[in-house]
């Protein structure tokens, strides 16, 4: 009706493309809607983003969750739903994803992004990435004994508890996946137990980067 195209919408937000209109038109549109809304209801104009990426992330019967990255006029990134804003990923995973998104949104250079990722993979294989960047942080959601499937963070949490640490729901567990042929949970160690070149490069390449 107003000449904007809906790019994405959910229960509490909507993203519109200008489709020939200006930023001022968008601001005026938001103001006109607020004049018609009852009581304290208000449509907040969040910002103008020259470029962005939206990824469909299905959640079964619950539909799709928010997963997008936007670049503001000042070059700042706004990221939602990607690994860079989640805790159960290593710092190297967050760094790589944020850098790749930045290259694509600011420079529109997919080839440069690919070269960057290949360089990180080479560094992981050569063990040039420091231990602090491969530490994974995962929060316990329930008591250790209540887990039927014991993932790496649960196994490490149990070992911490055996050492006398107070561990329970809400505890943030830090671990590094190390080299070896055993199952992953048995190769996951507390950071202080891991030598600088002991982490499993292939695991981080295939599951984090």
What are these regions (language model features)?
Residues 1-11, 16-209:
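DNA-dependent DNA polymerase catalytic subunits
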């Amino acid at each position: 009706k107003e000449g904007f195209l809906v790019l994405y919408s959910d229960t509490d937000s909507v993203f519109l493309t200008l489709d020939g209109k200006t930023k001022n038109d968008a601001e005026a549109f938001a103001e006109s809607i607020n004049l018609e809304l009852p009581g304290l209801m208000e449509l907040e104009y969040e910002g103008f983003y020259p470029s962005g990426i939206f990824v469909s992330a299905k959640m079964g019967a619950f539909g799709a969750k928010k997963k997008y990255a936007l670049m503001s006029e000042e070059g700042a990134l706004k990221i939602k739903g990607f690994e860079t804003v989640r805790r159960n990923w290593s710092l190297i995973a967050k760094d790589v994803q944020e850098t790749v998104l930045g290259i694509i949104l600011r420079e529109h250079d997919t080839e440069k992004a690919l070269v960057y990722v290949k360089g990180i993979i080479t560094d992981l294989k050569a063990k040039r990435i420091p231990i602090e960047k491969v530490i994974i942080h995962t929060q316990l959601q329930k008591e250790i004994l209540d887990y039927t499937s014991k993932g790496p963070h649960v196994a490490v949490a149990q070992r911490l508890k055996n050492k006398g640490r107070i561990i329970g729901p809400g505890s943030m567990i830090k671990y590094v996946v190390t080299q070896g042929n055993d199952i992953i949970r048995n190769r996951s160690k507390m950071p202080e137990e891991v030598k600088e070149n002991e982490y499993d490069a292939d695991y981080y390449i295939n599951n984090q980067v």
